[in-house]
Amino acid sequence: MKLRVAAAVLVIALAPLLLQTPYWRGILIVCAMNVLLALSLNLVIGYTGQLNLGQAAFFAIGAYVSTILTKTHGWNFWLAVPVAIAAAGLLGLALAAFAVRLRGHYLAIASLGFAVITYQVLINWERVTEGVRGIYGILPPPGFRDQLALFYLVAGIAVAVYLVLDNLVRSPVGETLRAIREDEVSAASLGINAARWKAFAFGLGAAIAGLAGCFYPGFVGTLVPEAFNIVESFTMMAMVIVGGMGTMIGPVIGAVVLTFLPELLRSIGELRLLVYGLALTLVVLFMPGGLVQLGAALRRKRS
C-alpha cells in the first residue's frame, strides 16, 4: 500500500511537468475529479453490491450547493464545502432509507429516478439554480486560481480520500460491507443490520461525490444542469467496472484510462466513439474483474 501511495505521489508531482499546456493540465484536473467520483461509486457498488445509477445527482448537489452559497450568498468557499458535502451525504442517506431494501434492478431504477428528478429540479428551479441559463463567472477556490495549484489540490484530496477508504475497507467495517455484498441473508443471520450498513455506504459515497462537485464549477467557470445528466452516472460506473470494482486501485485505474482514452482518440474523429465502445465491451466480456484482473494475470504469468 505504501508503494502505491508513493507511486501516486510521484505521478501527481511529475504529470503537470510532462503535460504543460493548459489543455492537458485541464484534463489532469478532470482526471483527479473522476478519481474521486469513481472511488465514491465503488464504495457503493463494489463493496456493498448496490447498483446505484444516480451518483451524478450527488455530484450536482455538491456543485450547486457550494456555488450558490459562495456566489449568491457570499460565503467563503472553505465554509461552503462542508455544507455541500453534508447536503449530498444527507440526501444520499435519505434516498438510502427508502432504497436500501431494494435489490438489483429495482435499486437501479430508484437511483436512476432520483438522478432524473434532481436534473429536472436543477432545470426548473430557476430562481435558485438559474435553470438552463446556468451560473457564470465562477472562480476557483481562493489561493488555487491557476491550473497547477488546482490540480495539486484536487489530486491531493483524491489521495487523502483513497487512504481513508482503503483503511475503512481493511477494517471490520469493510469486512461487514463485503459480507453483505456476498450474501445479505447470511450476513443478517450473523446479526449484521444490512440496511443500516448499506445506508452508511450509500451516504458516504454520496458525500464524496458532493466533495468532488465542490471543485467542478470553479474549474469550468460555469454551472449548467446538462453537466450532470444521466450519461455522467454511466461514465462513473464504466470507470469502476473497467478498472475493477470491489478493489481500491481499480477505480483509480479506470478513471485515469477513461479520462485520457477519449482525448488520445480525438484525432480519429467520430471513429473514436466506436473504438471507445469496443474497448469497453472487450473489457466487460473478457475481463469481468477489470484491468486489475489483467494486471494480476500478467504478474502470475511472469512468476
Identify the residue ranges that each predicted region occupies:
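Transmembrane alpha-helices and adjacent helix-loop boundaries
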Residues: M1-S303
